[in-house]
């Protein structure tokens, strides 16, 4: 879809050097906005996949960088307090206190305040997909984001909150699709908890960046919350097959071993990268209000991750090849290995 034609804005991104913020920075810069990044400056700036050296250097030269710790209120105020911005993006606030300092400075002066929340705030439900307005879980590990949204509303900030499900794509530091790629590449069975048919929602990071950038200039998004993910969801088994497809492997040869996680003690290790439940959202509101439509279906998106991230990490020797939890499951004689289709046959 065409981006809304808005004049260049002065935009602050708090965060912006790890993953989703990087893509948002590029998207906003490419639209002609004047971007300032505020972060600790500890993460080296990365060129995005497909970006030329010249484009990367141009983006850096046309961006203002301010170093500081967002958790140090005095330092943040000293570094940013005298600056003026039309739009503020908070990409990394986890607790209300993290965002309160930004609100103190820009809550009354910025025209728009965009907050990166999470679909993880929704309460587990018998009816799906999760929609904006559904019951939320005050005990969620993302409860800080819920409290932040409440604070933004209470203080009258012209905010828009974005709730993505699982974000994937090149440069992701959270090994979601990489977990599947690594095991498929090593010829391992894929150990999936439960019955393997839990539906989950994923969204490509580039699609997320476009959705977030599309908030700029759309006054009707103020005070609203939007889910963001792909228009379709996928079962765990289906994701395993799609990852194989992205790697050029035969999906019907993927070997899956289902297990009951209650049978095992994995200690501090995480045996599977996703929550064992249905977890996906409806995105109709974002598509309508943000004039947005995901450009990456899962096959295209996973291939992008495989070609532009996994293969590079493998060549650089940066993959996590710890299969201890996998071997515990695979070697457990209480569980039978099975081959499964991604979608159960009806009838």
Model regions: which residues?
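Mid/C-terminal beta-alpha module of Rossmann-like enzyme folds, strongest
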Residues: 214-278, 283, 289, 299, ...
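N-terminal Rossmann NAD(P)H-binding glycine-rich loop of SDR-like oxidoreductase domains
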Residues: 11-33
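Substrate-positioning beta->alpha
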Residues: 175-180, 194-216, 223-224, 238
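Short-chain dehydrogenase/reductase
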Residues: 128-149, 174-178, 201-202, 233, ...
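Rossmann-fold cofactor-recognition segment
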Residues: 56-72, 87, 92-94
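NAD(P)-cofactor binding segment of oxidoreductase domains
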Residues: 81-128, 143-154
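N-terminal Rossmann-fold cofactor-binding loop
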Residues: 38-42, 69-70
């Amino acid at each position: 879809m065409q981006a809304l034609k808005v004049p260049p804005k002065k935009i602050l991104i708090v965060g912006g050097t790890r993953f989703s913020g990087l893509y948002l920075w590029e998207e906003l810069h490419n639209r002609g906005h004047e971007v300032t990044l505020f972060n600790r400056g500890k993460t080296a700036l990365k060129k995005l996949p497909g970006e030329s050296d010249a484009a990367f250097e141009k983006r850096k030269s046309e961006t203002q960088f301010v170093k500081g710790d967002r958790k140090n209120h005095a330092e943040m105020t000293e570094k940013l307090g005298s600056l003026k911005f039309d739009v503020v993006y908070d990409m990394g606030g986890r607790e209300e206190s993290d965002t309160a300092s930004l609100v103190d400075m820009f809550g009354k002066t910025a025209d728009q305040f965009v907050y990166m929340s999470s679909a993880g705030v929704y309460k587990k439900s018998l009816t799906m997909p999760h929609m904006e307005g559904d019951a939320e879980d005050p005990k969620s590990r993302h409860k800080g984001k819920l409290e932040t949204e409440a604070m933004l509303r209470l203080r009258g900030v012209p905010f828009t909150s974005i709730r993505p499900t699982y974000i994937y794509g090149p440069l992701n530091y959270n090994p979601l699709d990489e977990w599947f790629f690594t095991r498929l590449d090593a010829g391992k069975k894929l150990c999936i908890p439960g019955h393997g048919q839990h539906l989950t929602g994923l969204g490509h990071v580039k699609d997320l960046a476009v959705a977030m950038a599309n908030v700029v200039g759309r006054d009707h998004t103020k005070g609203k919350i939007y889910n963001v993910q792909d228009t379709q969801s996928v079962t765990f088994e289906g994701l395993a097959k799609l990852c194989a497809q992205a790697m050029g492997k035969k999906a019907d040869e993927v070997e899956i071993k289902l297990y009951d996680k209650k049978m095992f003690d994995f200690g501090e290790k995480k045996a599977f990268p996703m929550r064992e439940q249905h977890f996906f959202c409806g995105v109709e509101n974002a598509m309508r209000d943000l004039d947005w439509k995901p450009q990456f279906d899962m096959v295209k998106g996973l291939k992008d991750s495989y070609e532009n991230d996994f293969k590079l990490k493998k060549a650089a020797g940066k993959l996590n090849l710890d299969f201890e939890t996998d071997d515990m499951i695979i070697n457990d004689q209480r569980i039978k290995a099975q081959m499964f289709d991604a979608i159960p046959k009806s009838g």
